[in-house]
Amino acid sequence: MNLSIQDELQLFSEELCRHLTPSFLEELAKKLGFVKRKRKFSGSELATICIWISQRTASDSLVRLCSQLHAATGTLMSPEGLNKRFDKKAVEFLKYIFSILWKGKLCKTSAISSTALTHFQRIRILDATIFQIPKHLASIYPGSGGCAQTAGIKIQLEYDLHSGQFLNFQVGPGKNNDKTFGTECLDTLRPGDLCIRDLGYFSLEDLDQMDQRGAYYISRLKLNHTVYIKNPSPEYFRNGTVKKQSQYIQVDLEHIMNHLKPGQTYEIKEAYIGKNQKLFTRVIIYRLTEKQIQERRKKQAYTESKKGITFSEKSKRLTGINIYVSNTPEGIVPMEQIHDFYSLRWQIEIIFKTWKSLFQIHHWQNIKQERLECHVYGRLIAIFICSSTMFKIRKLLLQKNKRELSEYKAIGMIQDHVSLLYQAIQRNTQDLTKILIRLFDLLQKNGRKSHRYEKKTIFDIMGVVYEYNGFGKQKKAA
Protein backbone atom coordinates (compact mmCIF):
# COMPACT_ATOMS: atom_id res chain seq x y z
CA MET A 1 0.00 0.00 0.00
CA ASN A 2 1.38 3.38 -1.03
CA LEU A 3 0.86 5.88 1.76
CA SER A 4 0.80 9.63 1.20
CA ILE A 5 3.62 11.82 2.53
CA GLN A 6 1.30 13.02 5.30
CA ASP A 7 0.31 9.46 6.26
CA GLU A 8 3.95 8.34 6.38
CA LEU A 9 4.95 11.29 8.54
CA GLN A 10 1.92 10.73 10.80
CA LEU A 11 3.07 7.15 11.47
CA PHE A 12 6.60 8.42 12.09
CA SER A 13 5.22 11.04 14.53
CA GLU A 14 3.31 8.41 16.48
CA GLU A 15 6.42 6.23 16.84
CA LEU A 16 8.57 9.21 17.87
CA CYS A 17 6.04 10.42 20.45
CA ARG A 18 5.67 7.02 22.08
CA HIS A 19 8.80 7.52 24.18
CA LEU A 20 8.98 11.31 24.49
CA THR A 21 5.59 12.55 25.73
CA PRO A 22 5.49 14.17 29.21
CA SER A 23 3.25 11.37 30.55
CA PHE A 24 5.61 8.62 29.35
CA LEU A 25 8.64 10.43 30.78
CA GLU A 26 6.94 10.89 34.16
CA GLU A 27 6.07 7.19 34.41
CA LEU A 28 9.58 6.19 33.34
CA ALA A 29 11.16 8.53 35.92
CA LYS A 30 9.13 6.82 38.67
CA LYS A 31 9.92 3.34 37.35
CA LEU A 32 13.68 3.99 37.31
CA GLY A 33 13.72 5.78 40.67
CA PHE A 34 14.71 9.20 39.36
CA VAL A 35 11.52 10.56 40.97
CA LYS A 36 10.23 9.03 44.22
CA ARG A 37 7.62 11.64 45.07
CA LYS A 38 5.97 14.52 43.26
CA ARG A 39 8.42 17.38 42.79
CA LYS A 40 8.90 20.36 40.50
CA PHE A 41 11.92 18.86 38.67
CA SER A 42 10.92 15.47 37.27
CA GLY A 43 11.71 13.32 34.26
CA SER A 44 10.03 15.68 31.82
CA GLU A 45 12.10 18.66 33.02
CA LEU A 46 15.34 16.65 32.83
CA ALA A 47 14.54 15.62 29.26
CA THR A 48 13.61 19.21 28.38
CA ILE A 49 16.93 20.64 29.48
CA CYS A 50 19.23 17.83 28.27
CA ILE A 51 17.52 16.92 24.99
CA TRP A 52 15.59 19.91 23.74
CA ILE A 53 16.54 23.37 24.98
CA SER A 54 20.27 23.26 25.75
CA GLN A 55 23.13 22.09 23.57
CA ARG A 56 25.58 22.92 26.33
CA THR A 57 24.45 21.07 29.44
CA ALA A 58 28.12 20.35 30.15
CA SER A 59 29.51 23.80 29.33
CA ASP A 60 26.89 26.47 30.14
CA SER A 61 26.79 27.78 33.70
CA LEU A 62 24.19 26.31 36.05
CA VAL A 63 22.63 29.78 36.32
CA ARG A 64 22.16 29.83 32.53
CA LEU A 65 20.68 26.32 32.53
CA CYS A 66 18.21 27.33 35.26
CA SER A 67 17.20 30.34 33.17
CA GLN A 68 16.66 28.20 30.05
CA LEU A 69 14.61 25.69 32.03
CA HIS A 70 12.42 28.45 33.48
CA ALA A 71 11.88 30.01 30.04
CA ALA A 72 10.76 26.68 28.57
CA THR A 73 8.72 25.18 31.41
CA GLY A 74 8.21 27.81 34.12
CA THR A 75 10.09 25.58 36.59
CA LEU A 76 12.13 27.66 39.05
CA MET A 77 15.35 26.01 40.29
CA SER A 78 18.47 27.18 42.11
CA PRO A 79 21.86 26.35 40.53
CA GLU A 80 22.71 24.14 43.52
CA GLY A 81 19.37 22.34 43.29
CA LEU A 82 19.79 21.70 39.57
CA ASN A 83 23.31 20.39 40.02
CA LYS A 84 22.06 17.87 42.61
CA ARG A 85 19.51 16.55 40.11
CA PHE A 86 22.33 15.55 37.75
CA ASP A 87 22.87 12.23 39.54
CA LYS A 88 23.27 8.54 38.67
CA LYS A 89 19.50 8.07 38.40
CA ALA A 90 19.32 10.97 35.94
CA VAL A 91 22.02 9.32 33.81
CA GLU A 92 20.17 5.99 33.94
CA PHE A 93 16.95 7.74 32.90
CA LEU A 94 18.46 9.41 29.81
CA LYS A 95 20.45 6.31 28.91
CA TYR A 96 17.25 4.26 28.98
CA ILE A 97 15.41 6.69 26.69
CA PHE A 98 18.28 6.62 24.19
CA SER A 99 18.37 2.82 24.28
CA ILE A 100 14.65 2.34 23.56
CA LEU A 101 14.81 4.92 20.77
CA TRP A 102 17.75 3.49 18.82
CA LYS A 103 16.59 -0.10 19.33
CA GLY A 104 13.04 0.82 18.29
CA LYS A 105 11.23 1.09 14.97
CA LEU A 106 11.86 4.71 13.97
CA CYS A 107 14.13 3.87 11.03
CA LYS A 108 12.70 0.49 10.06
CA THR A 109 10.56 2.02 7.29
CA SER A 110 13.22 4.48 6.06
CA ALA A 111 15.22 2.17 3.78
CA ILE A 112 15.76 3.51 0.26
CA SER A 113 15.51 1.34 -2.86
CA SER A 114 18.78 0.67 -4.66
CA THR A 115 20.56 -1.86 -6.84
CA ALA A 116 22.75 -2.69 -3.84
CA LEU A 117 19.66 -3.60 -1.80
CA THR A 118 18.81 -6.36 -4.28
CA HIS A 119 22.14 -8.03 -3.42
CA PHE A 120 22.78 -6.97 0.19
CA GLN A 121 20.15 -6.95 2.94
CA ARG A 122 21.95 -4.17 4.79
CA ILE A 123 25.15 -2.19 4.24
CA ARG A 124 26.72 -2.02 7.68
CA ILE A 125 29.14 0.83 8.42
CA LEU A 126 31.17 0.72 11.65
CA ASP A 127 33.42 3.41 13.13
CA ALA A 128 34.14 5.37 16.30
CA THR A 129 34.56 8.98 17.40
CA ILE A 130 36.47 10.10 20.47
CA PHE A 131 36.70 13.33 22.44
CA GLN A 132 38.56 14.54 25.49
CA ILE A 133 36.83 15.08 28.84
CA PRO A 134 37.96 16.58 32.20
CA LYS A 135 41.18 15.01 33.49
CA HIS A 136 39.71 14.18 36.90
CA LEU A 137 37.56 11.54 35.16
CA ALA A 138 40.61 9.63 33.86
CA SER A 139 40.06 6.75 36.31
CA ILE A 140 36.53 6.21 34.91
CA TYR A 141 37.15 7.16 31.28
CA PRO A 142 40.86 6.61 30.58
CA GLY A 143 41.86 8.18 27.27
CA SER A 144 43.55 6.64 24.27
CA GLY A 145 46.89 8.22 25.14
CA GLY A 146 47.24 10.12 21.87
CA CYS A 147 47.86 13.88 22.03
CA ALA A 148 48.37 13.57 25.80
CA GLN A 149 44.74 12.48 26.10
CA THR A 150 44.50 11.31 29.71
CA ALA A 151 40.69 11.12 29.79
CA GLY A 152 38.33 10.55 26.90
CA ILE A 153 35.00 9.11 25.80
CA LYS A 154 34.81 6.86 22.75
CA ILE A 155 31.47 6.33 21.02
CA GLN A 156 31.27 3.37 18.63
CA LEU A 157 28.47 3.11 16.12
CA GLU A 158 27.43 0.59 13.48
CA TYR A 159 24.49 1.59 11.31
CA ASP A 160 22.71 0.52 8.14
CA LEU A 161 23.36 2.80 5.18
CA HIS A 162 20.02 1.98 3.52
CA SER A 163 17.75 2.97 6.42
CA GLY A 164 19.89 4.86 8.95
CA GLN A 165 18.99 2.25 11.58
CA PHE A 166 21.51 2.01 14.45
CA LEU A 167 22.61 -1.64 14.68
CA ASN A 168 25.18 -1.51 17.48
CA PHE A 169 26.19 1.26 19.85
CA GLN A 170 28.63 1.73 22.72
CA VAL A 171 29.68 4.64 24.94
CA GLY A 172 32.87 3.90 26.85
CA PRO A 173 36.41 4.94 27.77
CA GLY A 174 38.65 6.38 25.08
CA LYS A 175 41.06 3.46 25.41
CA ASN A 176 38.40 0.86 24.49
CA ASN A 177 39.59 -1.52 21.79
CA ASP A 178 37.91 -1.12 18.39
CA LYS A 179 38.53 -4.73 17.38
CA THR A 180 36.78 -6.09 20.49
CA PHE A 181 33.64 -4.11 19.71
CA GLY A 182 33.82 -5.19 16.07
CA THR A 183 33.70 -8.83 17.18
CA GLU A 184 30.69 -8.12 19.43
CA CYS A 185 28.85 -6.65 16.42
CA LEU A 186 28.87 -10.08 14.74
CA ASP A 187 25.99 -11.10 17.05
CA THR A 188 23.56 -9.00 14.98
CA LEU A 189 24.72 -10.30 11.57
CA ARG A 190 22.14 -11.56 9.11
CA PRO A 191 22.80 -13.55 5.92
CA GLY A 192 23.14 -11.10 3.03
CA ASP A 193 24.55 -8.24 5.12
CA LEU A 194 27.54 -6.34 3.69
CA CYS A 195 30.02 -5.18 6.35
CA ILE A 196 32.45 -2.41 5.44
CA ARG A 197 35.34 -2.22 7.91
CA ASP A 198 38.40 -0.01 8.23
CA LEU A 199 41.83 -1.00 9.55
CA GLY A 200 40.95 -0.34 13.21
CA TYR A 201 38.46 -3.22 13.13
CA PHE A 202 40.54 -5.60 11.00
CA SER A 203 40.41 -9.22 12.17
CA LEU A 204 40.90 -12.34 10.05
CA GLU A 205 38.75 -14.28 12.52
CA ASP A 206 35.88 -11.79 12.19
CA LEU A 207 36.05 -11.82 8.38
CA ASP A 208 36.00 -15.62 8.40
CA GLN A 209 32.95 -15.57 10.71
CA MET A 210 31.13 -13.19 8.36
CA ASP A 211 31.78 -15.53 5.46
CA GLN A 212 30.61 -18.58 7.41
CA ARG A 213 27.37 -16.81 8.41
CA GLY A 214 26.46 -15.91 4.85
CA ALA A 215 27.41 -12.24 5.15
CA TYR A 216 29.76 -10.24 2.91
CA TYR A 217 32.67 -7.97 3.74
CA ILE A 218 34.89 -5.32 2.20
CA SER A 219 37.85 -4.41 4.39
CA ARG A 220 41.20 -2.70 4.14
CA LEU A 221 44.07 -5.13 4.70
CA LYS A 222 46.67 -4.44 7.36
CA LEU A 223 50.10 -4.34 5.78
CA ASN A 224 51.61 -6.63 8.41
CA HIS A 225 49.58 -9.47 6.89
CA THR A 226 51.13 -11.37 4.01
CA VAL A 227 49.24 -12.24 0.83
CA TYR A 228 49.79 -15.70 -0.67
CA ILE A 229 48.67 -17.57 -3.75
CA LYS A 230 48.81 -21.32 -4.31
CA ASN A 231 52.06 -22.51 -5.84
CA PRO A 232 51.28 -24.05 -9.25
CA SER A 233 54.51 -26.08 -9.01
CA PRO A 234 54.99 -27.14 -5.37
CA GLU A 235 57.75 -29.48 -4.20
CA TYR A 236 56.91 -33.06 -3.19
CA PHE A 237 58.34 -35.65 -0.83
CA ARG A 238 59.22 -39.07 -2.21
CA ASN A 239 55.93 -40.47 -0.87
CA GLY A 240 54.00 -37.97 -3.03
CA THR A 241 52.88 -35.53 -0.32
CA VAL A 242 53.36 -31.80 -0.90
CA LYS A 243 56.10 -30.04 1.07
CA LYS A 244 54.18 -27.62 3.31
CA GLN A 245 56.63 -24.74 2.89
CA SER A 246 56.26 -24.89 -0.90
CA GLN A 247 52.46 -25.00 -0.97
CA TYR A 248 52.03 -21.19 -1.16
CA ILE A 249 53.95 -18.34 -2.79
CA GLN A 250 54.15 -14.89 -1.21
CA VAL A 251 52.82 -12.07 -3.40
CA ASP A 252 55.17 -9.12 -3.97
CA LEU A 253 52.77 -6.21 -3.37
CA GLU A 254 55.43 -3.59 -3.96
CA HIS A 255 56.14 -5.04 -7.41
CA ILE A 256 52.43 -4.86 -8.29
CA MET A 257 52.20 -1.27 -7.00
CA ASN A 258 55.09 -0.16 -9.19
CA HIS A 259 53.37 -1.51 -12.30
CA LEU A 260 49.99 0.14 -11.69
CA LYS A 261 49.02 3.56 -13.00
CA PRO A 262 47.29 6.10 -10.69
CA GLY A 263 43.62 5.15 -10.28
CA GLN A 264 44.20 1.66 -11.72
CA THR A 265 42.91 -1.50 -9.98
CA TYR A 266 44.38 -5.01 -9.91
CA GLU A 267 42.81 -8.16 -8.49
CA ILE A 268 44.18 -11.43 -7.13
CA LYS A 269 41.06 -13.59 -7.34
CA GLU A 270 42.14 -16.59 -5.28
CA ALA A 271 44.39 -15.35 -2.51
CA TYR A 272 45.18 -16.45 1.01
CA ILE A 273 45.80 -14.05 3.89
CA GLY A 274 47.75 -14.87 7.04
CA LYS A 275 50.67 -17.10 7.85
CA ASN A 276 48.92 -19.65 10.07
CA GLN A 277 45.15 -19.24 9.78
CA LYS A 278 44.74 -18.60 6.08
CA LEU A 279 41.67 -16.67 4.89
CA PHE A 280 40.65 -17.50 1.32
CA THR A 281 39.47 -14.25 -0.27
CA ARG A 282 39.61 -11.77 -3.14
CA VAL A 283 42.44 -9.23 -2.86
CA ILE A 284 42.01 -5.95 -4.72
CA ILE A 285 44.84 -3.45 -5.05
CA TYR A 286 43.99 0.14 -5.90
CA ARG A 287 46.74 2.56 -6.96
CA LEU A 288 46.15 5.95 -5.38
CA THR A 289 46.30 9.14 -7.39
CA GLU A 290 49.13 11.58 -6.69
CA LYS A 291 46.75 13.84 -4.76
CA GLN A 292 45.60 10.91 -2.60
CA ILE A 293 49.22 9.90 -1.92
CA GLN A 294 50.11 13.41 -0.78
CA GLU A 295 47.09 13.48 1.55
CA ARG A 296 48.08 10.11 3.03
CA ARG A 297 51.69 11.17 3.61
CA LYS A 298 50.49 14.34 5.28
CA LYS A 299 48.22 12.30 7.54
CA GLN A 300 51.02 9.86 8.37
CA ALA A 301 53.35 12.73 9.31
CA TYR A 302 50.66 14.21 11.56
CA THR A 303 50.01 10.84 13.22
CA GLU A 304 53.72 10.26 13.86
CA SER A 305 54.26 13.72 15.37
CA LYS A 306 51.04 14.00 17.41
CA LYS A 307 50.31 10.43 18.48
CA GLY A 308 53.82 9.06 18.76
CA ILE A 309 53.10 6.25 16.29
CA THR A 310 55.93 5.21 13.98
CA PHE A 311 55.02 3.67 10.63
CA SER A 312 57.14 0.77 9.42
CA GLU A 313 59.32 1.13 6.35
CA LYS A 314 57.06 -1.36 4.57
CA SER A 315 54.01 0.80 5.32
CA LYS A 316 55.76 3.89 3.99
CA ARG A 317 56.84 2.10 0.81
CA LEU A 318 53.28 0.89 0.20
CA THR A 319 51.77 4.34 0.78
CA GLY A 320 50.76 4.45 -2.88
CA ILE A 321 48.17 1.66 -2.70
CA ASN A 322 45.05 0.61 -0.86
CA ILE A 323 44.72 -3.15 -0.41
CA TYR A 324 41.20 -4.48 0.05
CA VAL A 325 39.94 -7.96 0.85
CA SER A 326 36.40 -9.03 0.00
CA ASN A 327 34.22 -12.11 -0.35
CA THR A 328 31.62 -10.32 -2.48
CA PRO A 329 30.90 -12.13 -5.77
CA GLU A 330 32.82 -10.61 -8.66
CA GLY A 331 29.62 -10.46 -10.72
CA ILE A 332 27.97 -8.21 -8.10
CA VAL A 333 30.94 -6.03 -7.09
CA PRO A 334 33.64 -6.14 -9.80
CA MET A 335 37.14 -5.06 -8.84
CA GLU A 336 36.64 -1.60 -10.38
CA GLN A 337 33.81 -0.91 -7.89
CA ILE A 338 35.47 -2.19 -4.70
CA HIS A 339 37.19 1.15 -3.95
CA ASP A 340 33.90 3.02 -4.50
CA PHE A 341 31.97 0.62 -2.26
CA TYR A 342 34.59 0.95 0.46
CA SER A 343 34.30 4.73 0.23
CA LEU A 344 30.68 4.39 1.46
CA ARG A 345 32.29 3.97 4.89
CA TRP A 346 33.09 7.69 4.88
CA GLN A 347 29.37 8.45 5.26
CA ILE A 348 29.72 7.75 8.96
CA GLU A 349 32.34 10.52 9.14
CA ILE A 350 29.61 12.95 8.02
CA ILE A 351 27.41 11.74 10.87
CA PHE A 352 30.21 12.17 13.42
CA LYS A 353 30.95 15.62 12.00
CA THR A 354 27.38 16.71 12.79
CA TRP A 355 27.75 15.40 16.35
CA LYS A 356 30.57 17.83 17.04
CA SER A 357 29.97 20.78 14.72
CA LEU A 358 26.18 20.97 15.10
CA PHE A 359 25.37 19.25 18.40
CA GLN A 360 28.61 20.11 20.26
CA ILE A 361 28.73 16.77 22.04
CA HIS A 362 32.41 17.33 22.84
CA HIS A 363 31.99 20.71 24.64
CA TRP A 364 32.39 20.70 28.43
CA GLN A 365 33.64 22.58 31.48
CA ASN A 366 35.32 21.09 34.52
CA ILE A 367 32.18 19.38 35.85
CA LYS A 368 31.19 16.23 37.72
CA GLN A 369 30.79 12.86 36.01
CA GLU A 370 26.99 12.64 36.20
CA ARG A 371 26.42 16.04 34.62
CA LEU A 372 28.80 15.19 31.78
CA GLU A 373 27.02 11.87 31.18
CA CYS A 374 23.61 13.60 31.21
CA HIS A 375 24.98 15.95 28.55
CA VAL A 376 26.31 13.07 26.40
CA TYR A 377 23.11 11.00 26.50
CA GLY A 378 20.92 14.09 26.06
CA ARG A 379 22.90 15.04 22.95
CA LEU A 380 22.74 11.46 21.64
CA ILE A 381 18.95 11.45 21.97
CA ALA A 382 18.70 14.78 20.12
CA ILE A 383 21.11 13.49 17.47
CA PHE A 384 19.08 10.32 16.98
CA ILE A 385 15.80 12.25 16.70
CA CYS A 386 17.29 14.56 14.04
CA SER A 387 19.09 11.83 12.09
CA SER A 388 16.02 9.53 12.11
CA THR A 389 13.91 12.41 10.81
CA MET A 390 16.50 13.08 8.12
CA PHE A 391 16.57 9.43 6.96
CA LYS A 392 12.77 9.32 6.83
CA ILE A 393 12.54 12.50 4.75
CA ARG A 394 15.44 11.29 2.55
CA LYS A 395 13.35 8.25 1.62
CA LEU A 396 10.19 10.31 1.00
CA LEU A 397 12.03 12.85 -1.18
CA LEU A 398 13.48 10.03 -3.25
CA GLN A 399 10.04 8.43 -3.63
CA LYS A 400 8.26 11.65 -4.55
CA ASN A 401 10.85 13.70 -6.45
CA LYS A 402 13.71 11.26 -7.17
CA ARG A 403 16.09 13.65 -5.40
CA GLU A 404 19.20 12.97 -3.36
CA LEU A 405 19.23 14.71 0.02
CA SER A 406 22.38 16.15 1.59
CA GLU A 407 22.62 14.48 5.01
CA TYR A 408 24.70 17.27 6.52
CA LYS A 409 22.50 20.11 5.25
CA ALA A 410 19.35 18.27 6.28
CA ILE A 411 20.42 17.49 9.85
CA GLY A 412 21.39 21.14 10.32
CA MET A 413 17.98 22.34 9.12
CA ILE A 414 16.14 19.80 11.27
CA GLN A 415 18.18 20.89 14.29
CA ASP A 416 17.06 24.48 13.65
CA HIS A 417 13.49 23.23 14.20
CA VAL A 418 14.16 21.26 17.41
CA SER A 419 12.31 23.77 19.60
CA LEU A 420 9.24 23.43 17.35
CA LEU A 421 9.46 19.63 17.51
CA TYR A 422 9.64 19.87 21.31
CA GLN A 423 6.58 22.12 21.54
CA ALA A 424 4.59 19.86 19.20
CA ILE A 425 5.43 16.70 21.18
CA GLN A 426 4.08 18.40 24.31
CA ARG A 427 0.73 18.70 22.51
CA ASN A 428 -0.09 15.83 20.14
CA THR A 429 1.07 13.80 17.13
CA GLN A 430 -1.03 15.85 14.70
CA ASP A 431 0.91 19.01 15.58
CA LEU A 432 4.18 17.09 15.27
CA THR A 433 3.15 15.85 11.82
CA LYS A 434 2.50 19.44 10.72
CA ILE A 435 6.05 20.43 11.74
CA LEU A 436 7.47 17.41 9.88
CA ILE A 437 5.54 18.39 6.74
CA ARG A 438 7.05 21.89 7.02
CA LEU A 439 10.48 20.27 7.29
CA PHE A 440 9.75 18.09 4.26
CA ASP A 441 8.89 21.20 2.21
CA LEU A 442 12.04 23.00 3.41
CA LEU A 443 14.36 20.08 2.64
CA GLN A 444 12.67 19.57 -0.72
CA LYS A 445 13.53 23.16 -1.62
CA ASN A 446 16.96 23.65 0.00
CA GLY A 447 18.34 20.25 1.02
CA ARG A 448 19.52 18.81 -2.28
CA LYS A 449 23.01 17.32 -2.31
CA SER A 450 25.57 19.27 -4.33
CA HIS A 451 27.41 17.31 -7.01
CA ARG A 452 31.10 17.81 -7.54
CA TYR A 453 32.47 17.33 -11.04
CA GLU A 454 32.96 13.60 -11.78
CA LYS A 455 32.68 12.69 -8.08
CA LYS A 456 30.25 9.89 -7.26
CA THR A 457 27.72 10.36 -4.48
CA ILE A 458 26.40 7.66 -2.16
CA PHE A 459 23.34 7.22 -4.43
CA ASP A 460 25.58 6.74 -7.49
CA ILE A 461 27.61 4.01 -5.78
CA MET A 462 24.57 2.21 -4.36
CA GLY A 463 22.76 2.25 -7.69
CA VAL A 464 19.88 4.51 -6.66
CA VAL A 465 17.91 5.99 -9.57
CA TYR A 466 17.42 9.72 -9.00
CA GLU A 467 17.26 13.04 -10.83
CA TYR A 468 19.74 15.85 -10.56
CA ASN A 469 20.41 19.17 -12.23
CA GLY A 470 23.68 19.17 -14.07
CA PHE A 471 23.53 20.34 -17.66
CA GLY A 472 19.79 19.86 -17.86
CA LYS A 473 17.74 17.34 -15.95
CA GLN A 474 18.97 13.76 -16.12
CA LYS A 475 18.49 10.46 -14.38
CA LYS A 476 21.47 8.83 -12.76
CA ALA A 477 22.14 5.31 -11.62
CA ALA A 478 25.43 3.60 -10.85
From Swiss-Prot:
Biological process according to GO: DNA transposition
Transmembrane segments: none
Pfam families the UniProt entry points to: DDE_Tnp_1 (PF01609)
Gene Ontology MF terms in the entry: DNA binding; transposase activity
Function: Involved in the transposition of the insertion sequence.
PANTHER family: TRANSPOSASE INSL FOR INSERTION SEQUENCE ELEMENT IS186A-RELATED (PTHR33258:SF1)
Family of the protein in this entry: Belongs to the transposase 11 family.
Name the UniProt record assigns to this protein: Transposase for insertion sequence element IS231A
Source species: Bacillus thuringiensis subsp. berliner
